[in-house]
A protein has these predicted regions:
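Short, charged, amphipathic alpha-helical segments
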Residues: 30-35
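Amphipathic alpha-helical coiled-coil segments
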Residues: 40-50
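N-terminal acidic leader/helix
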Residues: 1-21
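Secondary-structure edge/capping motif, primarily at the C-terminal ends of alpha-helices
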Residues: 15-23, 29, 51-54, 58
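Short amphipathic alpha-helical/adjacent loop interface patches that line ligand
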Residues: 12, 37, 44
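Long amphipathic alpha-helical coiled-coil segments
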Residues: 36, 58-62
Length: 62
């Protein structure tokens, strides 16, 4: 499993935790939830690039 996939999973878990806290009225958890979403977005972009590179490498290998 790539590092970006691990990061996505970790940040998703963090987001779920913080979002639940925010829903219960903890406003500070909202900032942490947004940060987790931002980190997840970065990791998702990195994974998209990894997938594209692997796809192109497979194309060239044929």
């Amino acid at each position: 499993m790539s590092e970006s996939v691990k990061t996505i999973e970790e940040q998703f878990a963090a987001w779920q935790t913080e979002d639940a806290k925010f829903s219960k009225g903890n406003n500070a958890a909202g900032a942490r939830a947004r940060k987790a979403l931002s980190e997840m977005a970065k990791a998702i972009k990195a994974r998209r690039n990894e997938i594209t590179a692997e796809k192109n490498a497979r194309k060239e290998a044929k």
